[in-house]
Amino acid sequence: MADVRSIHTHPRHLEQPPARRGFVALDVGTARTRSMSSGGCAVADRPSAITGGPSGVPGPVRPLRHGVVADPAAYLRLVRLVLLEARWSGAWPPERVLAGVPVTATPDDRRAVGTAVAEVAGCEATLVEGPLAAAVGAGLDIAGPRPCLLLDVGAGLAEAVVIDGGVITDAAVLQLSATTGTGLPLYALDGVVGMTAGLLRRLPGRPRPAGLVVTGGGARQAPLLERLRAALRVPVGAAPEPGHATIRGLVSLCLRPDLEARATAGGR
């Protein structure tokens, strides 16, 4: 039986009525896929895998590698499965789908996402850089006067970004080739810490971020947070429910057309 979870979102993310009806927020990660529609009240959380590949290969097929589409046919099947589940929430057909993509997503990567969504849902996909959505989901003021510093650590990718004026102004990315049942192996932590420290050193002198917020499954690893604090010498904290920060942010952007317009200015 498929590992599918429904996790209720925090009420504050659902207080305001949808600005536009019929949306689906979609966060397809290397290991997990999260989605939520305008007619639902919970996040659907399932493995980023499908069974019964066309080549007859036994076992699950994982369409993504390091956060980007590696198997377009399998990715299409996964998106179809996730989006068709939205029919049960009464949000079908959606007017639009807001989907997260990595900072390093190429035009081909973005096209693969858009093609799959258009074929299944019959509407255009609006693409948002995943760390930007995660910052919104973590409660950061991405349009405030002070830049934000965020590190998103997923199963196949770590992305450290600087957000200023509602857009990502600088970023560093590290592909993660190995994870364990409890997250990153200890030897991989140094690479993530060094990457984030290098990004912080590139920032102008003033104004400085108030600290670093960590999202993604890696935010649950205490050794990572401890090493970041020691190396960066700034406040470091994990977002609430860090694995769901991106999908929360995507939903919030769907409810805030003004903020969405700024966040997606370079992501369509």
List PLM regions with ranges.
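Nucleotide/phosphate-binding catalytic cleft detector across ATP-hydrolyzing
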Residues: 1-30, 34-149, 167-212, 216-268
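C-terminal edge-of-domain segments
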Residues: 151-157
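Amphipathic beta-strand/beta-sheet edge segments enriched in Tyr/Trp
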Residues: 160-163
